[in-house]
């Protein structure tokens, strides 16, 4: 058989792009789970634009998110966040990293469901605390008890995050490993193929 007669093996990335069509990929989850880092690398793999919703919100408002919280309050921020995410999804397809509270808004969840595939990057309490301690600009953690705040937010948000289309365990492994798991799981979800069995630490982390 000549080389020309051999079937062309499609790549996972090509399969995903074909199945996505005009839809985007939206990463949801708590602060510190790696939405921006993983999203940027996924976008590079898929050759899609990467967009960070928080960065877009700051650009639209002309001030940082801590400044928005301080001057106008969380309610004002959430309204602007919903508008920005709606605009970004209308311009898809992109890989979009959202803020930790964005998915809590029902209208935003509905818009994401209609225009994207959502991935919940799920991390446990200790992983989140280790990561968020590295940054001092988290408005919701400007309290006397940031650890208690993370516990409360996890309790409130995880049942809602679980409505995402897919769940991937965010843990302390190389970022490219998480990206590969996202790609494999996306391909299986979109194309109906059986994804490779996740390693034991993934299976236990997402239960």
From Swiss-Prot:
Keywords: Amino-acid biosynthesis, Aromatic amino acid biosynthesis, ATP-binding, Cytoplasm, Kinase, Magnesium, Metal-binding, Nucleotide-binding, Transferase
Top EC class for this record: transferase
Any Pfam family the entry gives: SKI
Domain of life assignment: Bacteria
Pathway: Metabolic intermediate biosynthesis; chorismate biosynthesis; chorismate from D-erythrose 4-phosphate and phosphoenolpyruvate: step 5/7
Documented EC number(s): 2.7.1.71
Sequence positions that bind substrate: 54, 78, 100, 157
Reported cofactor(s): Mg(2+)
Biological process per Gene Ontology, one example term: chorismate biosynthetic process
Recorded GO CC terms: cytosol
InterPro entries (UniProt xref): P-loop_NTPase (IPR027417), Shikimate/glucono_kinase (IPR031322), Shikimate_kinase/TSH1 (IPR000623), Shikimate_kinase_CS (IPR023000)
Residues bound to ATP: 32-37, 138
GO MF term set: ATP binding; magnesium ion binding; shikimate kinase activity
Principal subcellular localisation of the protein: cytoplasm
Catalyzed reactions: shikimate + ATP = 3-phosphoshikimate + ADP + H(+)
Binding, Mg(2+): 36
Subcellular location, record wording: Cytoplasm
Biological function: Catalyzes the specific phosphorylation of the 3-hydroxyl group of shikimic acid using ATP as a cosubstrate.
UniProt family annotation: Belongs to the shikimate kinase family.
Name listed for the protein in its UniProt record: Shikimate kinase
Originating species: Bradyrhizobium diazoefficiens (strain JCM 10833 / BCRC 13528 / IAM 13628 / NBRC 14792 / USDA 110)
Lineage: Bacteria, Pseudomonadati, Pseudomonadota, Alphaproteobacteria, Hyphomicrobiales
